[in-house]
């Protein structure tokens, strides 16, 4: 799991 970013808006990107 990742954090909620602005690329996808879901917990998929690690920012």
UniProtKB/Swiss-Prot annotation:
It catalyses: 2 a phenolic donor + H2O2 = 2 a phenolic radical donor + 2 H2O. It is found in: Secreted. Its cofactor is heme b; Ca(2+). GO terms for biological process: hydrogen peroxide catabolic process. GO terms for cellular component: extracellular region. GO terms for molecular function: lactoperoxidase activity; metal ion binding. Its EC number is 1.11.1.7. Signal peptide: none annotated. Binds 1 heme b (iron(II)-protoporphyrin IX) group per subunit. Keywords: Calcium, Heme, Hydrogen peroxide, Iron, Metal-binding, Oxidoreductase, Peroxidase, Secreted. Removal of H(2)O(2), oxidation of toxic reductants, biosynthesis and degradation of lignin, suberization, auxin catabolism, response to environmental stresses such as wounding, pathogen attack and oxidative stress. These functions might be dependent on each isozyme/isoform in each plant tissue. Belongs to the peroxidase family. Classical plant (class III) peroxidase subfamily. This is Peroxidase 3. It comes from Solanum lycopersicum.
């Amino acid at each position: 799991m990742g954090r909620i970013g602005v690329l996808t808006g879901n917990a998929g990107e690690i920012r």
